[in-house]
Amino acid sequence: MSKEKQSFEEMMKELENIVQKLDNEAVSLEESLDLYQRGMKLSANCDSTLKEAEKKVNELMQEEVGDKGNEETTDE
């Protein structure tokens, strides 16, 4: 069974479901540990995805600043 990479939104939804299960349902210790472990993995993946997105946004902003700087020097 091959798993496709989950989108950020899918990971967040699964993480929310895990938190709800841990908060609201009577789950065994073993299941709680499994859910906690899965939640930690999802949290790390979400954090990584956000950092990648932030890096891309910063790169795009730097390109925009660079393009405006080039326009100003050619306009003079």
UniProtKB/Swiss-Prot annotation:
Catalytic reaction annotation: Exonucleolytic cleavage in either 5'- to 3'- or 3'- to 5'-direction to yield nucleoside 5'-phosphates
GO molecular function: exodeoxyribonuclease VII activity
GO cellular component terms given for this protein: cytosol; exodeoxyribonuclease VII complex
Keyword Hydrolase attached: yes
Signal peptide region: none
Keywords of the record: Cytoplasm, Exonuclease, Hydrolase, Nuclease
GO biological process, one term: DNA catabolic process
InterPro entries (alphabetical): Exonuc_VII_S, Exonuc_VII_ssu_sf
One Pfam family it belongs to: Exonuc_VII_S
Keyword check for Nucleus: no
EC number of this enzyme: 3.1.11.6
Subcellular compartments: Cytoplasm
SUPFAM superfamilies per UniProt: XseB-like
Binding partners and assembly: Heterooligomer composed of large and small subunits.
Purpose of the protein: Bidirectionally degrades single-stranded DNA into large acid-insoluble oligonucleotides, which are then degraded further into small acid-soluble oligonucleotides.
PANTHER family: EXODEOXYRIBONUCLEASE 7 SMALL SUBUNIT (PTHR34137:SF1)
Record family assignment: Belongs to the XseB family.
Protein name (database record): Exodeoxyribonuclease 7 small subunit
Encoding gene (name): xseB
